[in-house]
């Protein structure tokens, strides 16, 4: 049984390679990537042609599987609060998360939520595999940090279900995170003084470092993305992943086009 047929038996998203397989796409283009970023990899959605049909499918999936599964399993009483928390995580995917920021968001809507309830609901959402949490790691101090983590959606289609803005950079980062997880890596967000490295991916005691950006528009962008590794003193591989088709590799840091990287080329 092929990988995509096996996955079609359960509501788990395809990765990019599997999404191409089910669509019989041999030579993917940027348009295929954007379609995946926007609508995600849920197997059933590839049988739908119209954007309105795909959005309705994702909305129904969100209501019937995500919300109802969590509500039933954990006996959640405040369903509307749970929904708003999930929507907040969807709209802020790939951003640093803090309890105060989501509390301010909820208060702006006239909602009260204790820290205990908030963290319980967050844990329920993570346990449901709707989102995954990436802790921060202090590269200089060599220790994991317990606050200001990031959350990534298991499927990017949910991020664009209710949002009016399509943040390509955030979705690319989300897809790279999911791909690293699917490849068996433990993934953390790297912290060096006042800067950040998107991902430290560890497997079998070996590390790889990743910066993810949409495009390397100018010298400032190139300097920022490649300069993120300056504080890293080890010799493990370092990658900058973007949608560019020109190779900007420099100083031992490897630049990869995201489609090539996702296809493991």
Q: For each predicted feature, which ranges?
A:
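Accessory nucleic acid-recognition modules appended to NTPase machines
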Residues: 51-206
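Short regulatory helix/loop adjacent to the ATP-binding pocket of P-loop NTPases
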Residues: 1-9, 23-24
């Amino acid at each position: 049984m092929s990988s995509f047929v096996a996955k079609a038996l359960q509501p788990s998203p395809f990765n990019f390679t599997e999404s191409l397989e089910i669509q019989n796409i041999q030579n993917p283009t940027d348009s295929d990537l954007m379609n995946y970023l926007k609508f995600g990899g849920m197997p059933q959605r590839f049988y739908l042609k119209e954007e309105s049909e795909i959005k309705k499918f994702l909305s129904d999936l969100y209501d019937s599987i995500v919300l109802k599964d969590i509500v039933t399993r954990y006996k959640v009483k405040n369903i509307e609060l749970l929904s708003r928390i999930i929507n907040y995580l969807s709209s802020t995917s790939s951003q640093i998360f803090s309890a105060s920021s989501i509390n301010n968001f909820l208060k702006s809507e006239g909602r009260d939520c204790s820290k205990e309830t908030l963290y319980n609901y967050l844990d329920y959402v993570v346990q449901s595999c709707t989102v995954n949490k990436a802790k921060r790691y202090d590269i200089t101090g060599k220790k994991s940090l317990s606050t200001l983590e990031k959350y990534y959606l298991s499927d990017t289609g949910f991020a664009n279900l209710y949002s009016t803005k399509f943040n390509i950079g955030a979705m690319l980062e989300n897809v790279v995170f999911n791909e690293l997880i699917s490849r068996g890596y433990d993934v953390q967000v790297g912290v060096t003084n006042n800067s950040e490295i998107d991902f430290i991916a560890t497997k079998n005691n070996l590390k790889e470092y990743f910066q993810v950006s949409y495009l390397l528009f100018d010298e400032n962008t190139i300097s920022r993305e490649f300069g993120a590794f300056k504080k890293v003193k080890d010799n493990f591989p370092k990658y900058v992943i973007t949608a560019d088709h020109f190779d900007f590799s420099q100083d031992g840091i490897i630049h990869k086009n995201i489609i090539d990287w996702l296809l493991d080329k």
